[in-house]
Amino acid sequence: MPLRRTALSGSGTAGPSALSATSDGSTSATAAATDKVALRALVVAVDDSDYGLPTWKSTLDRVGAAYDVLLTRSTPLTADTLVRADGVGRYDAILLTSNGLLYAENGGYVSGLDADEWNVLWAYERDYAVRQAVLYGSHGTWPEDYCLQAASEGAIGATPLKTALTAAGARVFDYLKPSAQVPVVESYVYRTAVRPDCSATPLLTAGNDTVGVLSPSADGRERMMLTFTSNQYLLQSDLLVYGLFRWASRGLFLGEQRHYLHVDVDDWFNSADHYYPDGHIESDPGYQMSAHDAYNVSLRQQALRQKYPLAGSLTLGMAYNGGDANLRAGVRCSPYGGVGQLTATTRCLANTFRWINHTLTHPEMNFTDYATSRSEIADNLAVAQRLGLPVDGSVLKTGEYSGLGVYNPDPNNDTDPPTDFGLTASNPEFLRAAHDLGVKYLHGNMSFPSHRPVCFNCGVTHPLDTSLTVVPDWPTNIAYHCTTPAEETAFYNSFYGPNGKFPYWPTNLTYNQVISAETDVAMSHLSSGSLYTHTFHIANLRDYGSGRTLLTDWLDSVLGKYSSYYAVPVLNLDWPALAKRSVSRNGHFAQLAAGVDGVFDRAAGTVTVSSPQAGTVTVSGARTADATTYGSEVSAPVTLSAGQPVAITASPLP
C-alpha cells in the first residue's frame, strides 16, 4: 500500500521541534526527550467522517479526559504537534481510529499520514514511552507489523460473535469479569492469528482466532489493537474502548470512570392509576400500596444484594407524598398487612430505604403561588420528621417534574406529551419557595431537552436561580400504572408493538422480552458510567405473586447482565451525594474548558496539576488524602488556586 503525504487536523500550538533526524535518517527525540508527559490523549483520525472518531470521543467525554483530535487528511503532523517547547511531551496516550488511517481516493486507498509523519509519531512514542492503542485494524505489515496473519474476515450482524478474554486480556481489562463473553455485533471482523515468529500476545479471542492483540514493536514501543469495528452505541465499545484508553494512558488521566445504579420509586403513601390488560384505566380507588408490598420490597432488596455481591449497597430511593400518611400510626412491621398498616410498616422500615421529598400532595407546580409551593415542600418534610423518616431537605422531586418549564398548555390534557418551554419558563414562585427552604437539587427528566446537561454526568445550573441545580433522572417504560406482567406487557405493546401508538417492534413482545429490552437500555446506562437514577412508581412494587414485582424483575435482569460482564461494583449513592457528584462534574468540565494541565513526571513519580482558573479537577492515577479506589484504579479531586501548581503522588497502572 503506497504512502502519500496528506494531513492531520488538530492539535495545539507548536514550539521548537524536539524530534530530529539521526545520522542514519531515522527520526529521534532522544536528545530533547524528557521524562515528562501531559495527561492528555491524542486521537488520530482521517477526517470528521472517520467512523472511529465518535467512538473515541464518546469514551473520553464520558471519562472527562483531556484530549486533542488530529485529522490527518487536512493538517500536517510535525514534531511540534507532539512536544512542547520545554521538551514536555504533549500526550500520554496515542489513540488511532485505525492502524492505517486509510481513505479512498482516485480508485484506491491512501493514508492520512505519509512515511515521514508515521516516523515522527513512532519516534515520539518510543522516546517518550507513550503507548499506542488502535480501535480497529487488520493483519498485514503496512504501515507497521502487528505480528498478525489472516484467518478469515467478514461482517457480523445482530447475532453476536462471542469473544473471550485471554489471561493477558483479563489483566488489561481487569474491570471485566475474567470469564466475560464480550458480544460483538454490527461489525466487520478480521479473524487473525499471531505469527509464531513474533512476541505479540492475544488479548481477545473468538474461538481459536485472535481479535485483540498486544504487540510490542521492534523498537520497543507498546501497541494494542482490536481487529473489529465498533461504534459508540454498542455494548462492545462500552466494555472495551475505555480499557484501550486506560491501558494507553497507564491509568493517568483527568476524569474518572465508575459504574452506578440508582433507582427511585415515586408516590409512596399516594395512590396510582391502575391499568388493566384490556386497556381500561381505573383511578378510583386505583392502586394503593399495602404494608405487605412495602415489607416484601425490603425482602427483595436484601435478596438482590445477596444474589449480586457487586450490588451489595443497593438501596432504593422512595419519593414520598406525606399527605396520605397516617400520622397517628405506630412503629410496627406487618409483613402481611393491608393499606391501613402501610404507615406503621413504613416507620418500621425507615432505615431500610432512602427517602426523597416529593411534595405533600403531588400537585403540578407549574403555576402554584409561593405560599402553596412552600407549604407543599415544608409540610412534607414535617411529615417525614414526625414519622422518623430520614430526609435531606436539599433534594426535591416535584410531581411529574413540574415547575421546571415542561407542561401541557392545556391543563386538562393529561395524555399528550408535554411541551418543553425551557427552564426559563419554570415557575418563579416555586423556585423562590424551594430556595428559601434550602433546596439545592431538583430532579429533572432526561426526556426533556432543557433538563439534559451539556456534559456527561453533570447537572444543569438553573438559569433563574443559580443556587439550584437540576439533576435529571432516566425514565423507564415500566409504566407508572402497571402492577403485573400481563398489565405491563399489554401496555408496552399498545405503545411499541406493530399496532401501537409508536410502532417499533415487528411483533408484540412477551413479558420476558419486554424486561430484556428495557434492561438492555438500562445496561447501556450502567456500562457507559451514567450517574443518574432510574424512575419507577409504587404500582411497580405490587407483589404480583411469590414476592415478585415489576421493579425487582427489572433489577434482577439488569444486575444479572451487569454481573456477567463486570468485576467492579456498581455504586449506589444517596441523593445528596449523587447530586454533589453531578455538581463536581460541572466543575471538572469547567476546568477542562479553562485549560487545566496535568503533567506526569516519570522520574519523580508525581503529577503536577495547574490551571489559570481556581476550581477542582478529578485526576485518575493520583493518590491524595481524598483519593478513592475502584477496582485497581485510584482517583482524587485536586483543588487548585489560579496559577498555582499542585504536585501529587502518581499511581500509574502497569
Language model features by range: what are they?
Residues 595-629:
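Carbohydrate-binding surface patches
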Residues 130-207:
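An acidic, glycine-rich "communication" segment
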Residues 42-134, 140-142:
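Helical hinge/lid and interdomain linker segments adjacent to catalytic or ligand-binding clefts
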Residues 229-231, 245-274, 475-572:
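Catalytic grooves of carbohydrate-active enzymes
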Residues 1-18:
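Secretory targeting and sorting signals
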Residues 190-269, 274-312, 319-320, 332-335:
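Non-catalytic propeptide/linker segments at domain boundaries
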Residues 632-654:
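C-terminal beta-strand-rich structural cap/linker in extracellular carbohydrate-active enzymes
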Residues 39-42, 99, 119-120, 125-128, ...:
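Metal-dependent polysaccharide deacetylase catalytic core of the NodB/CE4 family, i.e.
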